[in-house]
Amino acid sequence: QSAIKYIRDTFQKEFGKEMNLERISAPLFVEKSSGLNDNLNGVERPVQFDIAGIKDEAVEVVQSLAKWKRMALKEYGFQPGEGLYTNMNAIRRDEELDNLHSCYVDQWDWERVITKEERNEETLKDTVRAIFKVIKHMEHEVWYKYPQAVKILPDQVTFITSQELEDRYPGKTPKERENLITKEYRSEEH
């Protein structure tokens, strides 16, 4: 638990600095009529309840912050190149439970303002490289403090499209293709 807290706290600080993001608190619930709750796939039912001080209005536990983050960027006056990061706590009552999924969600999230001209593949790749730079730095910090918790990452990120993966491994499932390409580029647990 202490390693998880260390990674989370340090990553948020380093990532926020690298990406020019400010920490903003996210709501636990929103008024149903606000339209800010994301219905995900359209079939998940949000947890809903009433609050004594809010007459004739139900509130819903947030399921996703997608709409809220964009509203917050505008409301707080963020400019291109600036953004926010936040933490979402949610209950997803229709989640299919397994080793990776729970009905309780504790999710870290971020959003940044970009210009129309920046909506392109190169901006996406530059953003991924910046994120990877922080992750690589974190790998070293974590190794120094918790050597047993580290996975060895490659020195640089590799980009490949779904089509390129399918062409390279035509008889494999998408998950098998992912596993094969990560082994090839050494992004695996050691």
Describe each region flagged by the PLM.
Residues Q1-H101, D109-V113:
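Class II aminoacyl-tRNA synthetase-like tRNA-binding/catalytic domains
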Residues Y6, T10, D126-H137:
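Long, highly charged amphipathic alpha-helices
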Residues E14, T127, R168:
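Residues that form generic nucleotide/phosphate-binding pockets
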Residues K32, E189-H190:
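Intrinsic disorder/low-complexity segments enriched in polar/small residues
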Residues D98-C103, E178-L180:
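Short, flexible, solvent-exposed loop/turn segments with mixed acidic/basic and small polar residues
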Residues T115-E117, E121-K125:
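Well-ordered alpha/beta subsegment
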Residues A130-E189:
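Metal-assisted phosphate- and nucleotidyl-transfer catalytic regions
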